[in-house]
């Protein structure tokens, strides 16, 4: 099990990213627009830099929903390989069966 503080920190980052997503996209669009004057684009870049660092989507780490493990993460199930193996062996993941040939 991962540290509770690490899990909570990641959840806080996800909430911040969701809250600032629209503003961040708007500022990025202005900064990338080549038709606007350089001063306006630079001002948008400065405003973007003033936003909280943890509001960037790249700061969010994919973690297992059950254990909080950050590595060996399967996006489709939002679980780590260990939790997925346990749940699959108990038959708790629909359609997943142990392979046999």
UniProtKB/Swiss-Prot annotation:
Annotated Gene Ontology cellular component terms: cytoplasm; small ribosomal subunit
Q: Matching Pfam families, A to Z? A: Ribosomal_S14
- PROSITE patterns from the xrefs? RIBOSOMAL_S14
Keywords, ordered alphabetically: Ribonucleoprotein, Ribosomal protein, RNA-binding, rRNA-binding
Q: Which Gene Ontology terms cover its molecular function?
A: rRNA binding; structural constituent of ribosome
Biological process according to GO: translation
Spell out the InterPro entries in the cross-references. Answer: Ribosomal_uS14, Ribosomal_uS14_bac/plastid, Ribosomal_uS14_CS
What's the superkingdom here?
Answer: Bacteria
Similarity-based family: Belongs to the universal ribosomal protein uS14 family.
Q: What does this protein do?
A: Binds 16S rRNA, required for the assembly of 30S particles and may also be responsible for determining the conformation of the 16S rRNA at the A site.
Quaternary structure per UniProt? Part of the 30S ribosomal subunit. Contacts proteins S3 and S10.
Q: What is this protein called?
A: Small ribosomal subunit protein uS14
